[in-house]
């Protein structure tokens, strides 16, 4: 029998947790920190893309328009929209023979 097997095999009366009746504040703090860490890790895995996209791009959706005349705002909106619009006439059909 290897040493590892002997270490992994507990004695019957040692199956219970030794810290059940412990009122040590360090044990309580470690338990709370462990639970919070687990919750935060799960939330991080679930909302990974959303959270890091927020950090990367911030809370704003675009540049601030404060103090910019309305005509310039409209011009900016039109440029943004024209960059998004796709002209259907410029597609190229490639036929493989």
Curated annotation (Swiss-Prot):
The lineage of its organism: Viruses, Riboviria, Orthornavirae, Negarnaviricota, Polyploviricotina. Cytoplasmic tail plays an important role in virion assembly and morphogenesis. This is Matrix protein 2. It comes from Influenza A virus (strain A/Wisconsin/3523/1988 H1N1). When the channel is activated, one or more imidazole moieties of His-37 probably become bi-protonated. The record marks 37 as: Essential for channel activity, possibly by being protonated during channel activation, and by forming the channel gate and the selective filter. GO terms for molecular function: monoatomic ion channel activity; proton transmembrane transporter activity. It comes from the Viruses. The record marks 41 as: Seems to be involved in pH gating. InterPro entries: Flu_M2. Glycans are attached at residue 20. One of its GO terms (biological process) is symbiont-mediated suppression of host autophagy. The M2 protein from most influenza A strains is inhibited by amantadine and rimantadine, resulting in viral uncoating incapacity. Emergence of amantadine-resistant variants is usually rapid. HAMAP family: INFV_M2. Keywords: Disulfide bond, Glycoprotein, Host cell membrane, Host membrane, Host-virus interaction, Hydrogen ion transport, Inhibition of host autophagy by virus, Ion channel, Ion transport, Lipoprotein, Membrane, Palmitate, Phosphoprotein, Signal-anchor, Transmembrane, Transmembrane helix, Transport, Viral ion channel, Virion.
């Amino acid at each position: 029998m290897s040493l590892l097997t002997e270490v992994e095999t507990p004695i019957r009366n040692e199956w219970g947790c030794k810290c059940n009746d412990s009122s040590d504040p360090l044990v309580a703090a470690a338990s709370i920190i462990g639970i919070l860490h687990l919750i935060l890790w799960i939330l991080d895995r679930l909302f990974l893309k959303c959270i890091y996209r927020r950090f990367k791009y911030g809370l704003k959706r675009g540049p601030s328009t404060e103090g910019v005349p309305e005509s310039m705002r409209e011009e900016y909106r039109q440029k943004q929209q024209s960059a998004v619009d796709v002209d259907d006439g410029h597609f190229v059909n490639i036929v493989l023979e």
